[in-house]
């Protein structure tokens, strides 16, 4: 069964700049035309060389703002700030959420760090980010989302990511603890929508990526996520006038070649996911014939944010 609406699919390779092996895998996917867009983690160990690769191959690139892993970019925040722990690192994926819930994060410092990351992005790439999302979805957290929206508007960055995946709760392969974390992300993201709209920020109609990370990525899972998302979207907009028959989707991906324990990361060394075969698995799925054939059969147009 083919899909009725015209589909524009942005396939984003996250964590570009995390390590050379990751970067090589993402660039290989771009050359294979299965990744259309990358998100640069600016405090990553290979951020400068990754930016050079993007310039060399004309890869559409945005900023993967990072407030949860490694060192801050802003010099004045590296010694004494609410964003770092006693080792000088960001508080981590769960740590930043705990600090936020306790009211211990200084939002003026969040603003300084986001602005410093945009400034460094401009220095490395020679351009403004074409879009801006975040590492571990911190940009939709309460308090941070308001600052994030203001910073994007001030820097004229028009696109971001809203990590709400329709049909996520149907995915029985996701462990309960991880599903609870995803539910929290989606709740925060839904509460972010009006804030981002107020600041003129846009995002694709649909998002896919939570149900298809790492070993959970398969051509079938991506196809089903697209089908379910598009059908749900069609039923939502069917009563609205003057809606054209097209839908935009972002597929968040993390392809690459596994890193070694000695390389990569954002100052603390690479995480387990970076060193696992899950990265290679995603790369192989994205380049697989079944997925390519699905896109071809359904007229899916792979594109970048600049094409939306």
From Swiss-Prot:
Cofactor: Mg(2+)
GO MF annotations in UniProt: deacetylase activity; hydrolase activity; magnesium ion binding
InterPro entries per UniProt: Glyco_hydro/deAcase_b/a-brl, YdjC-like
Keyword Metal-binding: yes
Recorded superkingdom: Eukaryota
Function in brief: Probably catalyzes the deacetylation of acetylated carbohydrates an important step in the degradation of oligosaccharides.
Top EC group: hydrolase
Protein name stated in the entry: Carbohydrate deacetylase
Native source species: Xenopus laevis (African clawed frog)
Keyword Protein biosynthesis: no
Keywords noted in UniProt: Carbohydrate metabolism, Hydrolase, Magnesium, Metal-binding
UniProt record similarity statement: Belongs to the YdjC deacetylase family.
Catalytic residues, chain numbering: 14 (proton acceptor)
């Amino acid at each position: 069964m083919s899909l009725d609406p015209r589909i524009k699919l942005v396939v984003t390779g996250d964590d570009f700049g995390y390590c050379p092996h990751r970067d090589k895998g993402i660039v290989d996917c771009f050359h294979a035309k299965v990744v259309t867009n990358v998100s640069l983690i600016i405090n990553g160990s290979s951020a400068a060389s990754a930016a050079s690769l993007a310039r060399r191959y004309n890869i559409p690139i945005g900023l993967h703002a990072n407030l949860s892993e490694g060192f801050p970019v802003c010099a004045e925040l590296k010694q004494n700030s609410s964003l770092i722990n006693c080792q000088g690192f960001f508080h981590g994926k769960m740590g930043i959420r705990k600090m936020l819930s306790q009211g211990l994060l200084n939002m003026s410092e969040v603003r300084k760090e986001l602005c410093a990351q945009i400034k460094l992005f401009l220095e490395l790439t020679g351009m403004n980010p074409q879009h801006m999302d975040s590492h571990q979805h911190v940009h939709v957290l309460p308090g941070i989302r308001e600052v994030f929206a203001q910073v994007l508007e001030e820097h004229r960055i028009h696109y971001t990511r809203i990590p709400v995946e329709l049909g996520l709760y149907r995915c029985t392969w996701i462990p309960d603890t991880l599903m609870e974390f995803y539910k929290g992300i989606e709740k925060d993201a839904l509460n972010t929508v009006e804030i981002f709209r107020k600041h003129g920020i846009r995002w694709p109609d649909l998002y896919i990526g939570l149900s298809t990370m790492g070993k959970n990525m398969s051509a079938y899972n991506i196809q089903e996520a697209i089908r379910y998302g598009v059908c749900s979207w069609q039923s939502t907009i069917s009563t609205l006038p003057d809606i054209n028959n097209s839908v935009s989707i972002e597929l968040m991906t993390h392809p690459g070649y596994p890193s070694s324990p000695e390389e990569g990361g954002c100052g603390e060394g690479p995480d387990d996911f970076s060193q696992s075969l899950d990265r290679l698995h995603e790369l192989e799925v994205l380049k697989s014939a079944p997925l390519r054939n699905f896109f071809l059969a359904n007229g899916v147009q792979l594109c970048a944010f600049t094409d939306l």
